[in-house]
Amino acid sequence: MHLLKVGTWRNNTASSWLMKFSVLWLVSQNCCRASVVWMAYMNISFHVGNHVLSELGETGVFGRSSTLKRVAGVIVPPEGKIQNACNPNTIFSRSKYSETWLALIERGGCTFTQKIKVATEKGASGVIIYNVPGTGNQVFPMFHQAFEDVVVVMIGNLKGTEIFHLIKKGVLITAVVEVGRKHIIWMNHYLVSFVIVTTATLAYFIFYHIHRLCLARIQNRRWQRLTTDLQNTFGQLQLRVVKEGDEEINPNGDSCVICFERYKPNDIVRILTCKHFFHKNCIDPWILPHGTCPICKCDILKVLGIQVVVENGTEPLQVLMSNELPETLSPSEEETNNEVSPAGTSDKVIHVEENPTSQNNDIQPHSVVEDVHPSP
């Protein structure tokens, strides 16, 4: 017995995953945009009596919208315990030793833009913002509103706290801020996430479509095998020519349950394994998609040795067979392959048996002639 497994796989066009890849590519334009960071080269001088100690280095980073230019002045923190300068009434004690001064403000409490606005309204030429406690000397480029001709720099918490405490002890501290090196940051966390997601998505689509392609090829081979087996085994069903005097053409005789027409002389009928017979041109298109007898629902294909297993979630066998084998064993082809010469007034019934093909697909039909004496 031939055991065939039948399933359908709907092949999606390549445009679906190409569209998804295009969307990912468009999203990547924002993720892959280079991030430019300008470092601040600072020369900090500590005036202690007649001594001046200087400290040089790239200790800060310019804000995103900061003016990139050189600026110098005395560092002045806000008065009072609160050093975030979020209050518009914040007071800065300007030094009498310099016309230009730089506001030293602690991060937090409000936006960077609000801090810068308060300091510039008080006359600051630049703003130095130091990070919150617990961050060490970590810095990052701040996002803030652009202020004309105002330099905005961030320094680490340790350095900012050190400067603040020295100023509170009466040490005069000045700073010269110059534009340092430019850093282009390509590999940020957005880009890394995008690369990981894109790689995983592309790998999924590639393996998914390769898998679907392999399944489609296997399915096509199964259908070809099923078609061949049906052609070979369907020939085992007998053909008969209805003649004058047969009981089928009597007024009380049966009619074909498919076309509802009575049998006439010289009609070719096919006899199923359950002994029911029908017009050959009616039963052949029926038996292929249905596989059962129209009267008793006998599984003709199973009796002939073909068992069709339909997987869960697939279309019914009737739809599959009608779609895949629309021309298989059509009435015209059957009549060509199994030509039966109707007998005129002969008293012989001709049974034409179609043997299944051998491995080389050579069909060897043979006829069996039997003497039949009509009833008086």
UniProtKB/Swiss-Prot annotation:
Keywords, in A-Z order: Endoplasmic reticulum, Membrane, Metal-binding, Transferase, Transmembrane, Transmembrane helix, Ubl conjugation, Ubl conjugation pathway, Zinc, Zinc-finger
Pathway: Protein modification; protein ubiquitination
InterPro entries associated with the record: PA_dom_sf, PA_domain, Znf_RING, Znf_RING/FYVE/PHD
Record's comment on post-translational modification: Auto-ubiquitinated.
Substrates-to-products reaction catalysed: S-ubiquitinyl-[E2 ubiquitin-conjugating enzyme]-L-cysteine + [acceptor protein]-L-lysine = [E2 ubiquitin-conjugating enzyme]-L-cysteine + N(6)-ubiquitinyl-[acceptor protein]-L-lysine
Transmembrane segments: 190-210
Superkingdom in the source lineage: Eukaryota
Any one GO CC term of the record: endoplasmic reticulum
Domain PA: 65-167
Subcellular location: Endoplasmic reticulum membrane
GO molecular function, one term: ubiquitin protein ligase activity
Region (Disordered): 327-376
Zn finger intervals (RING-type): 256-297
Keyword Lipid biosynthesis belongs to the record: no
GO annotation, biological process: protein autoubiquitination; ubiquitin-dependent protein catabolic process
Expressing tissues: Expression is testis-specific.
Class in the EC hierarchy, top level: transferase
Keyword Repressor: no
Enzyme Commission code(s) on record: 2.3.2.27
Composition bias, Polar residues: 355-364
UniProt topology in membrane: Single-pass membrane protein
Known partners and oligomeric status: Interacts with E3 ligase UBE2J1.
Function: Has E3 ubiquitin-protein ligase activity. Plays a role in male fecundity through the interaction with the E2 ubituitin-protein ligase UBE2J1.
Name of the protein in its database record: E3 ubiquitin-protein ligase RNF133
UniProt source species: Homo sapiens (Human)
